[in-house]
Swiss-Prot record:
InterPro entries: EFG_II, EFG_III, EFG_III/V, EFG_IV, EFG_V, EFG_V-like, EFTu-like_2, G_TR_CS. GO terms for molecular function: GTP binding; GTPase activity; guanosine tetraphosphate binding; translation elongation factor activity. It holds the Pfam family GTP_EFTU_D2. It comes from Shewanella oneidensis (strain ATCC 700550 / JCM 31522 / CIP 106686 / LMG 19005 / NCIMB 14063 / MR-1). It is found in: Cytoplasm. PROSITE patterns: G_TR_1 (PS00301), G_TR_2 (PS51722). This is Elongation factor G 2. One of its GO terms (cellular component) is cytoplasm. Catalyzes the GTP-dependent ribosomal translocation step during translation elongation. During this step, the ribosome changes from the pre-translocational (PRE) to the post-translocational (POST) state as the newly formed A-site-bound peptidyl-tRNA and P-site-bound deacylated tRNA move to the P and E sites, respectively. Catalyzes the coordinated movement of the two tRNA molecules, the mRNA and conformational changes in the ribosome.
């Protein structure tokens, strides 16, 4: 087994098309894991192994790959850059100790790279920066370095400088060693020479080397003092300082190269070894109670502790069901019986594998620091904790965003319903941001997801992987309802039909709640007019109705219910009677509280070439967008806006038309906002028409 200090669990993340997957391919080639390099544009890359990924040239699932470099074991996760698949980024950041943030040398800090950077900051994942594609037209390393400061508020620590640019790019100067690494044009990564710094770069190299040293020695007071007195620190001392500053995210070591042309990659791999943390150098994962509150205990990263592992991904592939697991503490051996603390059930570990994209090598055991796949686990879902039967525990839960878009689907073949249900069940286990519901009125199957592309891919997987062809309805927006006025009201539930009856009277106030508060229940009852034992029934009854509002049947948000008084009968009152009273109170009073329809607002980030900015902004305004910011770059303008989701369907096609294919955009859910009356009326009418059409079927 590899020593814990020599593990590196890293993710590679960036904007769509910045070169993440190609970077991963080069890492695998250099570490000897693959012999022929797969190219993304050929549909042959190792980590993009789904048919949909190969065809679209984007990464959808986080593929996990193990490899070795200089006696260190890398567990590498290649994450998607498209915003519809950010759940994969969330998921992988949870189990990573460090990362490589890839930026395009010409595109710079693009919309999705900003989102991923924010997620990585929130997860406190140490990173190095790799500015890729320096062989591209318009590439400018130092411009991208400046963008990371200006746009991401990052502190990039320049470690190398490029030799040549665009077509002339041939290598890099290592600022620490003052050595130039120059590659030939064969595309073979090992074909390079180590030379002296080119004469025309000496002054620039010394300038940036001095900045590097000044930043690094701030991590060590003694070194800083010695440096101020004119003593130059050794390379080993500098590396130690850079490692410390990287781990605390004081700065981000920044490299450059061309993954596609195989130039500069070795220095990035060396940086992973030298600067990114081992599993026992990051803050340990907190343990929680059943409600998700931290207990004050932690999963100490050590093979000698009791087992604590997190199932972070479920996949169904040609080999069967795979559960990807990060082991935080303890050991796991083939044949062990472990506890799933979420279900309370035990499972016996059959086969365990070290993953290499869509291939695998079976292993007998694994321990703290490992990322592995377990074959054939039955009752495990993403986010479940796997632990020692004698030492139950729960790791901090994974939180996933709520879906904002839905489509109705039905199998083309009438006998395909069961096949579809089984397939969708497997897909939900794999992707927690993908949901399914059955419409109570129509009986239709409703698929919910994070965006058009997300659901498009799911329909494609159902067809190709599971052989289920679907009839797909128009995308539907996840509207919500709320109230805008306070109502003081009462309701009495009374039923007598011989024998003991049912009785429950409640007096209450409903009022608008705080934003994002959901449903809040309070009781100010005094004197026992409604005994305390019935309060939970009142809360349960009212809360159960929050899924169906009175305007158009959408879920209701942000309502506060206060139970103020009431009455009960010693014989006829029961929990069920008060629950029924609360349900009726909802129907009676929500309609009086001036209900309002809410629509999801998306945070939209658009890149437009300079000559199309006017068209792009005009189009966003027509879509009821509110422009928040415009940031000028070298190659175009970033426009940030809040836009209703209902106005964004088909936007990618419009943007491509307006910008001749050069525009890009990302969007993510921001908040719910009141619908204008004209929009609300239209939505209500559409719901009525849909229900009328369903009633005729």
């Amino acid at each position: 087994m590899t020593e814990l200090s020599k593990y590196r669990n890293i993710g590679i993340f960036a904007h769509v098309d910045a070169g993440k997957t190609t970077t991963t391919e080069r890492i695998l080639k250099l570490t000897g894991k693959i012999h022929k390099i797969g190219e993304v544009h050929d549909g042959e890359s190792t980590t993009d192994f789904m048919v949909q990924e190969a065809e679209r040239g984007i990464t959808i699932q986080s593929a996990a790959v193990s490899c070795f470099w200089k006696d260190h074991r890398f567990n590498v996760i290649d994450t998607p850059g498209h915003v519809d698949f950010t759940v994969e980024v969330y998921r992988s950041l949870k189990v990573l100790d460090g990362g490589i943030a890839v930026f395009c040398g010409s595109g710079g800090v693009e919309p999705q790279s900003e989102t991923n950077w924010r997620y990585a900051n929130e997860s406190e994942v140490a990173r190095i920066i790799f500015v890729n594609k320096l062989d591209r037209m318009g590439a400018d390393f130092l411009r991208v370095v400046k963008q990371t400061k200006d746009v991401l508020a990052a502190n990039p620590l320049v470690m190398v400088l490029p030799i040549g640019i665009e077509d002339e790019f041939c290598g890099v100067v290592d600022l620490l060693t003052r050595k130039a690494y120059v590659w030939d044009d064969s595309g073979i990564p090992e074909n390079f020479e180590v030379k002296d710094v080119p004469a025309n770069m000496v002054d620039l190299v010394e300038e940036y080397r001095e900045m590097l040293i000044e930043t690094a020695v701030e991590q060590d007071d003694d070194l800083l003092e010695a440096y101020m007195e004119g003593e130059e620190p050794s390379i080993e001392d500098l590396k130690r300082c850079i490692r410390k500053g990287t781990r605390t995210m004081a700065f981000f070591p920044t490299f450059c190269g061309s993954a596609f042309k195989n130039k500069g990659m070795q220095l990035v791999l060396d940086a992973v070894v030298d600067y990114l943390p081992a599993p026992d150098e990051v803050d340990p994962q907190p343990l929680t109670d059943e409600e998700g509150n931290e207990t004050g205990e932690y999963a100490i990263v050590s093979a000698d502790e009791s087992l604590k592992a997190l199932a972070f991904k479920i996949m169904d592939d040609r080999f069967g069901a795979l559960t990807f697991v990060r082991i935080y503490a303890g050991r796991l051996k083939k044949g062990d019986t472990i506890l799933n603390s979420a279900t309370g059930k035990t499972e016996r570990i059959g086969r365990m594998c070290e993953m290499y994209a869509n291939d695998r090598i079976e292993i007998e055991s694994a321990e703290a620091g490992d990322i592995i796949a377990i074959v054939g686990m039955k009752n495990v879902q993403t986010g479940h904790t796997l632990c020692d039967v004698k030492h139950p525990c729960t790791l901090e839960a994974m939180v996933f965003p709520e879906p904002v878009i839905s489509i109705a689907v039905a199998p083309k073949d009438k006998g395909g319903s069961e096949k579809m249900a089984i397939a969708i069940g497997k897909m939900i286990a794999e992707d927690p941001s993908f949901r399914v519901e059955t419409d109570e009125d129509s009986g239709e199957t409703i698929l919910k997801g994070m965006g058009e592309l997300h659901l498009d891919i799911k329909v494609d997987i159902l067809k190709r992987t599971y052989g289920v062809e679907l009839i797909v309805g128009e995308p539907q927006v996840a509207y919500r309802e709320t109230i805008t006025a306070m109502v003081e009201d009462q309701y009495t539930h009374k039923k007598q039909s011989g024998g003991s009856g049912q009785f429950g009277k409640i007096e209450y106030i409903i009022r608008p709640g705080e934003p994002n508060s959901g449903f809040v229940f309070k009781s100010s009852v005094v004197g026992g007019s409604v005994p305390k034992e019935f309060w939970p029934a009142v809360e349960k009854g009212f809360a159960s109705m929050m899924n169906t509002g009175t305007i158009a049947g959408f879920p209701v948000l942000d309502v506060e219910f206060e139970l103020t008084d009431g009455a009960y009968h010693a014989v006829d009152s029961s929990a069920i009677a008060f629950e029924i009273a609360a349900k009726a109170a909802f129907r009676q009073s929500i309609a009086k509280a001036k209900p309002q329809l809410l629509e999801p607002i998306m945070k939209v980030d658009v890149f437009s070439p300079d000559d199309n900015v006017g068209d792009v902004i005009g189009d966003l305004n027509r879509r009821r967008g509110m422009i928040k910011d415009q940031v000028a770059g070298i190659t175009g303008v970033r426009v940030k806006a809040d836009v209703p989701l209902s106005e964004m369907f088909g936007y990618i096609g419009s943007l491509r038309t307006m910008t001749s294919g050069r525009g890009q955009f990302s969007m993510e859910f921001s908040h719910y906002s009141p619908c204008p009356n004209s929009v609300a009326d239209k939505v209500v009418e559409q719901v009525k028409e849909r229900k009328a059409a369903e009633a005729k079927k």
